[in-house]
């Protein structure tokens, strides 16, 4: 009877194991873990942050073909971005102000703050890599363009990163060399462009 509840059977088990071996597991498999060291030869120098949108993962390049991999939430289809930028500022317990200017600023360090425990500010206006109290959004296309991380993961990443660190977002690993030679370029989310124009 227990086998009937799981309609996948042996075929599903084999497919699941193959998917884990080939793709390195699904986005949800890491939701409770800190960064995981993996083999990832993406062709970028150590210290680079690479976001692979279709995997919903962020890689911190450690060097020698290795990276620290974190599950993340990326922008929704309308706000998904690709390109190369860099970390322009870093804050512990950052305050959050609504993008549209309406509403009060939420002070840093409280559990309901949408930016979580740490924020890495990117050179593109309003874009950040930050923590979140919305753990269920990790592994999804759920944000307005920011990259959300579990609070424990962004705290760990914060200690590895420095201001000026390159940040590259690509749609898939096939695009790994697309932004290697460019400084700041790519497609920003619509709201970030609007904010830059103000």
Predicted regions and their residues:
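Bacterial N-terminal signal peptides that target proteins for export
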Residues: 2-14
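Cyclophilin-like peptidyl-prolyl cis-trans isomerases
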Residues: 3, 30-31
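Hydrophobic alpha-helical targeting segments used for export or membrane insertion
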Residues: 11-22, 83, 96
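C-terminal segment of classical bacterial N-terminal signal peptides
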Residues: 20-30
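Flexible, glycine-rich phosphate/dinucleotide-binding loops
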Residues: 21, 67, 176
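Cell wall/extracellular polymer interaction/catalysis modules
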Residues: 31-94, 109, 117-118
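Exported/periplasmic cell-wall-interacting domains
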Residues: 44, 64, 78-79, 94-95, ...
